[in-house]
Amino acid sequence: MNTSNLDITKKSSVNQRNKERITYLMIKQKIKLLWNKAQMDAFNSNNYIIIKFFKKYTYFLNLILKDNDINSYRTQLKTSFILNSKLTISLLFILIFVGVEASSILFKEIYNQRAASKYFKKLNIQFNNFQYIGYINHLTYKSVPSFLNKEQRIISELFFPKKYGAFSNKKIWDELNCYKINKFNEYITIDPLWLFSNKKKYNLINKKKLNSLSNKTTKIILYESENEEEVNDKNSKENKSLLMDEKSISSSNNIKVKRFDLLIDSEKKDRQLLKVSFQKDDNFSFINNKIFGYYYQQLNNYLNIKKEIILAIEKLIFYSIKKKKVNLWVKNEAPLEYQGQPLKLINNRSLKASYLINKLTDRSNEKIAVTSKQNKFYFKKSPLEAQRFKNKKKFFIASFWQRFRSFLKETPYYFDYTNRIFSKKKFELLSLNKKKISPKDQTQNQEGYSIYLDKSHDIIPFEQINLNNPLGTKGVIYNIKSNNKKYYNLFNYRSRPFVIHAGIKKYLRRKKKNSYFRRRKINNISSNTLLKLKKSYTQNLKMPVFLNPNQWGFYYSKSLKKNIKNRELISPLVNLPIAHQREYLYNSKYLPFVFTNLENYNVYLPNLNKNLQNKVNSDILLKSYTYLPKSVKNKKKYTSVFFNLLKQKIILPDKLINYYQDGNYLKFYFFVSWFLLIELFSILAFMQIFISIFYILRKSIGEIIIELMHEVSGHLNNVTEDLKSWLPEYFFKEPFEWQFFEASTKSFENFAEKENLKRFFDPYILALQYTKSNLRLPFFNIKLDINILQKPIKSYKKFKSIVLSNNEKEELLIKPILLVGPPGTGKTLLVRAIAGEADIPVIQFIVNKDSPGFTRELVPEYEKLSKAFEYAKSIAPCILFFDEMDSLAPKRGGGYFGENAWAEIRLNNNILPYEFSPLKAPEPQKNKMDKFKTKKVKPRGTLLQLLYECNNLSNEKPILLIGATNRQNEIDPAVIRPGRFSTIYNFSLPNSSERIDFCKFYAAGLSMDKEIPWDYIAKRTVGFSPSDISMLMKESSLYGVLNNTKHTLKSLEHGIDRVLGVSKSYLSTLNISKKNVYNKILHMAYYKVGLTLLPLLFKQEMPAFIKLWPMQERAIVKQNKLEENIHSSEWDTLATLEQKLILRYGGKAAELLFSYLDKDLSDEGFSELSAGQLFITFLVDYYNHYSRSEPLGIIPTLLKKRSSTFWHNYEYNLFEFKNIINGPSNVYKEPLIGFYGIEGAESFYDQKDKAKDILDIKDKHAQSLNSYLWWYQYVPKDIFKIWTTSLKNQKWSRFWLPDPELSFFNLDFVNAEIYVSELIDTLLPTWKFNNQGLRKLNKKTRTVWPQIKFATHEYIVSCLILSSLNKAMEVLDEHREFLDFCVAHLIKEEILREPDILKNLKRFNLEKYHPKNNLEKDQFKDNKKLNILNKYTIVSRSGGLNSRRPFPLWIDVDTITKNN
């Protein structure tokens, strides 16, 4: 007998490696697509496929869940991920599905290169594997008949063990275990992992001893040598035999095959793959001289597997395949091009491959052309999904069949119509009741709904379906023969009917013959015969039906109806309920079965005896089946193959049996082929790869996987009671309402100030770690020194020694913690960090009263809370986290307690029996006690349950309760009393320095520009939470990667805009064609610049930036900024508050300086003016800064300061107010006091007359620009076109205005007190007095005190508004050139930043306003130099050396006095 040879491949050439790399990446991408498909099917409600498939591969869970060597992994799952095997079971649903799909791909491609290639050349890749399974069976049975005869029983019992309901069958598994050589010694496969291990440790097969074997079967045993020197010494006589026959193995008791450690030399980058080639003998058949079927003996060692081994296994599997269709990529040695750009420009080969894969799999591109110099081919949609057809007709048939089959997948008629799609026969679908109804008739169901189906209707509306009896709803099927509509009762879909699958005729037809089957009788089989057989056993079938209301029926479009009619296809125009989940006919996960229960099948198996034709239950096993085409050449081969298949019988267990009326068990024949063994090995290989990859990536995507697994478990509640027995009990816990069960991989390293967190939370962490060792909860002394806790204690042993050394042996529970702070401040992240540091799981309980949960039933909230505590105690120690604590334990209302409750309410809430209005009659107010009495009391069950659970915490099962809320005032006081959630940690928004630290903390991974103004960034991020800053830096990193830059100022501003949700849609609203659009832009620019510059000129904190176009901010950021401004104004003085009031009117003052006409003023700044009005209300009413301490409380000090001559006769007697009554005439004659403080001026009337004379003589136009300024030459000239707007018909206003020629005073200026006095005159009625005394007035003319209070209140408010606005205009006009310069910069750049403003202060001689120059330079000069200034009188100040006022105008007083 020939021996096997071990060939070590040499290093391949560069071209060959490139080919292999491309092939590897293409297949890897195909597996990725399959993985996505598996995820969609796994997390879809249609997971019935996975459940059934899970039954079939029960043995597979035996390896994962029942192996003793995997206990460490199970423990790690429990502590770090999720409860025990929940993740593993849910993961198997996906991995097995993907593994089988991928194995079917490899299975096809391997046999394409073998002897079966002559058959495969005539087939299409899309075609079902099982439609040509006979070819594979023929090859395998011919090569290894002895193997199948001997091992058929073991494989069959493996798939369908006797104890079918259990998760494992240890006996059968032991027979397949390679370590039990004495029980299972027919064949031993090779583990591919040892091919990559160290050569010195492992020995391969010895050729000499292989030749000396006397047994026919080839046995390959891996042996681990204890001494490496024995391996090196090839001629050593002590070297044990690696190959033994059956007798020697059974007789030698001392020989033990050890486990193999997966070792690999990480230093070797370019690793050579080993090829093991064997010659074909009577017992083994190796395809393409390479091993493909591998049985992984050491699957439990995947915990130690490395990433390089995973890649090596993939290479071993993938490189043994020669693709047929994908070979188009391998043959093109020339560099590929994508849309005309060669991919060779990318130097890195891995980047090049990933770039190619990403471009080819982009589904957004409908058409992608990939060209090469050697060959040109065209892909429609994605190249990985497309195929190349030489024949256009064949391509059309394939594309049509693919679209039509995808449509039929979503319908319950998938199995019923696949046999008639390409059939020439026209026949109609018959039902159990053959009663026909004319189209004009009207039918009614049980609910009384009328269904009209005439020629104008194509479908049955959803509303007309009887939900109580959906299977009894009438339907319609289109008949091609008679071209009319007929009514039939729908099928009873509780069990699947027998349907003949004749296959697709045009796919496998030969060139000369049109018939697909040899015998024409097959096509003549109608469904009526099958339905009659179905009727006999469906009556007593008690399989429950699970219906999903969201999946009722389907609809045909009219265009599809025409296409089907033209192609002579049956069109089911019905709306049917889906009573069972759909299953794929072409899926390779089902084994091939042959029907033997009907006489019609005798044409397929003519050589079978009739006594072997037992009835089969199709609902359990016959999900996918096929029939083999007959031909003259292969007729004898198939008959012999089928005869060999039907030898062994298997009896199903009681749990999965459906009974006939006579109660006999159903029996069937099970067929085993070489494909089963290959499928088993390939599944194990892919399971090894995927589990290893998930183990490596568990720290980064572990939480996402867990959440997806819980979604899978949530959908499993739709399964029937029969299927629930196959799943663990915790899948169906009621209620399962907590959000997720996890232990986070977060730690204190995720925080910037980790030392402070450790100082506070180390006692909790250490106490929880101590309880994990199943010991008693340690004593925690409150009186510990603070110095001990300042440094984090890393080991709980040290903590134990410190704590237990105290004499006070009092046990103290871990008290609950309440975290309070705004959203995004890291409350939930801190909980995960505590869990990660303590290495314990976390249960997050989220209150949602409207959530039905997984059970689809409304469960009381307090019951969910009780279940959560029970579950937490079962896995203690753990953390039970309550997010949004205010919704779980809201404050109770409905009454107050105590004897003096009403007095306390009245004093605290200022409740009066009546409410006074200043200008209205007294109106009664409702008593608030009535509201308290009528207020409904909310259910308190959840709150009481929480209080009960908090009081019953014990040391035996320690649970750390942590709550989080941003509204502490809404929580019931009983929850936060001492002993419960008494430990409160407040989280606040970061300040400016902390925001800078957060930005630098989250900027790791991408370098930063050195010239970033961090003070500017800190001001722009006012009100940002740490989560907002994290998102900001992520957006900045993405912007930098896409633009190939670092973290720059532009990238950070882009991130800020993304966080705030700023959009540039404002430009689309502007109509450029309008004449006043430029004027509108200028108004907006002046307003924003004035609002920004005025704080700088008052030496206050200015805004960080302004944008030309309006932007929107998130509500939470606005709220945080408003709260910060309110809190900062609580302790300000009156001067500071008045300054803030003036700053509110800076924008409107700058706009008035630009345009004085009322018709040109815009509505810009409404929010600021409203805020100023609110601020004045606080000053006058809340802070009471402008009222005296007299009993009346209405005499403002502002009036006394502004017009002292008016109030000189005032007395404090309340009934002597003659002067007040006659006061308005004296107000007009009071001396005028302006902003310059000029006293002794002329009266108001004289000034008014002179002003009229001046206005009549002078031009009526308002102020105009005298000349262009010096800084005009530094900005584009096009910008100043918007300044050429007409200034005609502008009149003087009553506000203070500067004169173009720098005059000191404008005669038209009207003081604020005089302007408001007119309001007083209109509000106060006229009083008439006699010399004898007062006369009683009527009610209409009677003045009450609230009216006088209102008049004076309005006077104060108006004075503050006008005075603030005039002061803002005066200050901005003094620096008008700098204002215009900033406006020009804003219009040009569309943004004006604080650093840009500060840089230009020196050019305008405004260095004193720089924030760093807090003190003026004049204060440090000598007194002698200061005296010189007294000799001069400054007329006008200097505007800077570059301005049109480079030097100040002054008068030498000494010179004038000397001349006099």
Swiss-Prot record:
Similarity comment: family membership: Belongs to the AAA ATPase family.
Membrane-spanning parts: 87-107, 674-694
Keyword set, alphabetical order: Membrane, Plastid, Transmembrane, Transmembrane helix
Originating organism: Helicosporidium sp. subsp. Simulium jonesii
Localization annotation: Plastid membrane
Name under which the protein is recorded: ATP-dependent zinc metalloprotease FtsH homolog
GO biological process, alphabetically ordered: protein import into chloroplast stroma; proteolysis
SUPFAM superfamilies cross-referenced by the UniProt entry: P-loop containing nucleoside triphosphate hydrolases
